From Swiss-Prot:
Reported function: Accelerates the degradation of transcripts by removing pyrophosphate from the 5'-end of triphosphorylated RNA, leading to a more labile monophosphorylated state that can stimulate subsequent ribonuclease cleavage.
MF (Gene Ontology): bis(5'-adenosyl)-pentaphosphatase activity; guanosine-3',5'-bis(diphosphate) 3'-diphosphatase activity
Protein name: RNA pyrophosphohydrolase
Pfam families listed in its UniProt record: NUDIX
Motif window: Nudix box: 46-67
Length: 163
């Protein structure tokens, strides 16, 4: 997967895949980041490895961050294109070894078919300190500011599924 699109910083975007995990009553999984001093919530997401499709990366990230395995989800939809965000200036050069100026993301809506007990955030490399099911409309306020537009667009893309 190439990171060929450049952001305003002149640095390429890091290819990433994300998951909007939806429970049977229409609430969305949100994890509170373990590495952020404030209450920063986000949905499962992460980089796409070389040779990996965005869908494969999304399913891998779901397992790595939540313990939810592919047999416990039904993939419902994919964002029609890449969604991008730029890192704020204070983070440029500090994350991802300074190689990227933001992310280009493909998002997947997935229906969670399991029980809440299948969610295990105490993974090998934990990213979340706690998790909850949230209304999509409430999720955006808890996201770090530089990702809010991405989340709003993704949730809008999946609005019919979330309704």
């Amino acid at each position: 997967m190439s990171a060929d699109l450049l952001g305003p910083s002149g640095l390429p975007y890091r290819p990433c895949a994300g998951v909007v995990l939806i429970n049977p009553v229409g609430l969305v999984f949100a994890g509170q980041r373990i590495d952020n001093p404030g209450p920063a919530w986000q949905m499962p997401q992460g980089g796409i490895d070389r040779g990996e499709s965005p869908r494969e990366a999304a399913l891998r990230e779901l397992v790595e961050e939540t313990g939810v395995t592919p047999d416990l989800v039904d993939v419902l939809a994919e964002t029609p294109g890449w969604v991008t965000y730029d890192l704020p200036p204070e983070l440029l050069g500090k994350v991802w070894k300074g190689r990227y100026g933001g992310q280009k993301q493909k998002w997947f809506a997935m229906r969670f078919l399991g029980e809440d007990s299948a969610v295990r955030i105490a993974t090998e490399h934990p990213e979340f300190e706690r998790w909850q099911w949230m209304r999509a409309a409430d999720l955006i306020d808890g996201i770090v500011p530089f990702k809010r537009d991405v989340y709003a667009r993704v949730l809008s893309d999946f609005r019919e599924i979330l309704a």
